[in-house]
């Protein structure tokens, strides 16, 4: 990862840091690539499934009625599949409560953003 790329911590609604954004790529706390963010702030898994959107805070949210995207897109692969996360991150800002029918993906459904080697909805090797 180049030194010019800024890592933005992504928080849960509880205030825990659970991911990093090195735009447009998302990485988990261990530094593994877990997703991609479009210019419209839509979040996709490494397997190309729609997961939700990047809200202010920042945090990753989705509507319960949307579900996990069955339609897939081809997302660009980062130059580096892994980053070295920093040892310390800033405290989470105060975030508004979620409205009814909206969930925090990293808090309630983190399995929607698996690393590239994992995930139930990845393509078969056959």
Predicted feature residues:
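N-terminal leader/targeting segments and the first structural element of proteins
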Residues: 1-34
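Long terminal segments
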Residues: 1-8, 49, 55-126
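Preference for short coil/turn "hinge" residues that link or interrupt alpha-helices
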Residues: 14, 30, 47, 93-96
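Compact, well-ordered interaction domains used in eukaryotic information-processing assemblies
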Residues: 24-25, 30-57
């Amino acid at each position: 990862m180049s030194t010019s790329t800024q890592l933005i911590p992504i928080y849960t609604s509880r205030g825990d840091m659970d991911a990093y954004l090195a735009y447009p790529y998302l990485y988990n706390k261990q530094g593994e690539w877990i997703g991609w963010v479009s210019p419209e702030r839509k979040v996709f898994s490494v397997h190309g499934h729609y997961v939700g959107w990047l809200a202010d805070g920042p945090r990753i949210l989705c509507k319960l009625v949307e579900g996990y995207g069955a339609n897939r897109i081809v997302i660009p692969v980062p130059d580096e599949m892994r980053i070295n996360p920093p040892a310390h991150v800033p405290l989470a800002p105060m975030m508004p409560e979620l409205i009814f029918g909206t969930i925090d993906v990293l808090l309630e459904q983190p399995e929607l953003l698996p690393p590239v080697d994992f995930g139930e909805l990845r393509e078969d090797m056959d």
